[in-house]
């Protein structure tokens, strides 16, 4: 084939199409096109998405060189783009990056009107986000994933367009007060994810957001329990909740809830007593105020842990008049004492799914299975 007459088809494309193509490339490759010609340098300046990850860019043997090279690379990328508008900025860095360099990067993208901001800062030195993050009028989507030391310390919060907030492994300087301040400054918030947030050390935890539609909270440890948890979310339709039973639930407003995934757990010392057969007739903790407020759901997923809670930490199982789909997780260490009452109180149930049938044998499974003699576990029902 004669290629002598071939031409650069991509370079001849209209600028808006070429820029759109660049937006699908990893930032490192997109930035490298700026050396091809003045045109490509101009086009890179208008790439709307930047994804910067120090683990995938440069890999010299010396760790210091990695950090320095990456920091210099970010400086060059932001300089190339100047003040052009930015849609999404994602920054993932580990320890070794100078925190002093990070703040100007964040301020740069905020000043350019970024709408999606994803910060994964796994630092081992003290670091506070610049206050401008909490006063950005253009943010619609904000994800904060921190390591050991970065914390959220807020005074004034005004995020008028923010609809999605994701916070993972993050410490609040003022504990529950800090979370309350943050949420109160998000008048349009619809999606909230709180993952690995140790609110058991707080005096109280409050999620009060009238506009919220979806909430996910996850805390996996069960050595401690939260003192007080308040959920005032009247328009919430989806809830995924993993936590140890709290000391109290002063207010739980879930009137619009349609789908719930619940993994409530007993405190570990109480769980040990339960497994050893102590106090099986005594209630441990009290999840009644929480459980009673999810009775409007149509779709419900219950973990094996939650079956324990229904048995030993709930005054009564509410009537689930709207429930049509129920999924129950099984575990060989957990009995089904609460299952008969749960099924009896679900008069409109259409679909029942058991994720595993192995469970701890007890005398109180009622007519839900064939557990007649208590053995270590029942293989099937």
UniProtKB/Swiss-Prot annotation:
Which PROSITE patterns does its entry note?
Answer: FBOX
Matching Gene3D superfamilies, A to Z? Answer: 1.20.1280.50, Ribonuclease Inhibitor
One Pfam annotation, family name? F-box
Q: Which UniProt keywords apply?
A: Leucine-rich repeat, Repeat
Record-linked SUPFAM superfamilies: F-box domain (SSF81383), RNI-like (SSF52047)
Start and end residues of each F-box domain: 7-60
By what name is this protein known? Answer: F-box/LRR-repeat protein At4g14103
Tell me what organism the protein belongs to.
Answer: Arabidopsis thaliana (Mouse-ear cress)
